[in-house]
Amino acid sequence: MTRENIFVRSLESCETMANASVICADKTGTLTQNEMTVVAASVGIHAKFVRKPYRFLGGEVSRGSIPGNFGPAGDLSSPNLAITPELAKLSHAAITVISTTFEDLDPETGAAVFIRSKTDTALLKFARELGWTDVKHPREATNILQMIPFSSDRRSVGCVVKLPNGGHRLYINGASELLTKGCTHYAANGATRGGGVETAPIGKAEGDSISCTIKSYASHALRTIALCYRDFSHWPPNGARVTDNGEVRKVFLFGTPNV
């Protein structure tokens, strides 16, 4: 069981599983191949992508459109052609810096594999497919001030980094249906004069579009993850409450979704 990376909290559970005859799971791939893969993505609101025609629940979803979404969807291999370099760099940082997954060699095959979280592995593989830099470079080049571990209450994980301009940035990845409710802006496909990412306010129409996108993915048994961030001049921010274990509260109500 150790070789298979199986953690058993209670020994009685082994006997329970030995008598199980049916296993029901809501995520495809975790049982069949023991891995997860990014098959669709949305950047901001208007840029949507899907992998080459794939099937879910017996039905095919082509890259021409995603049911319930607004507008057509491009090929998942082409986000670099549709978004700015600034937005691509931000997305890459949100994926790599916040993750604790590392790369190692498989003792049986000798191939390079990612170790730990299956979800993080899927995101890191997706970043590699797009030709973004490796995992180590962003982490080594980033001054990480605080890691905020995953919590089942907020269903998200966070990381605070210090920016070259002296400011601070909070990255948050997690359940999209929760994180997007606290977001005030979304990432637009543009760049500011200072080389940052252009953002636009989330109004009712934009909020409905984001909600529709999330529901569309969920209807195809997909796990939807939101990549969000917020910049601060100081960390911890003024008015924030720091708990005994060093965790900062009341800072997760804003961000820019980049699903």
Where are the regions a protein language model picked out?
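Conserved cytosolic headpiece of P-type ATPases
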Residues: M1-V259
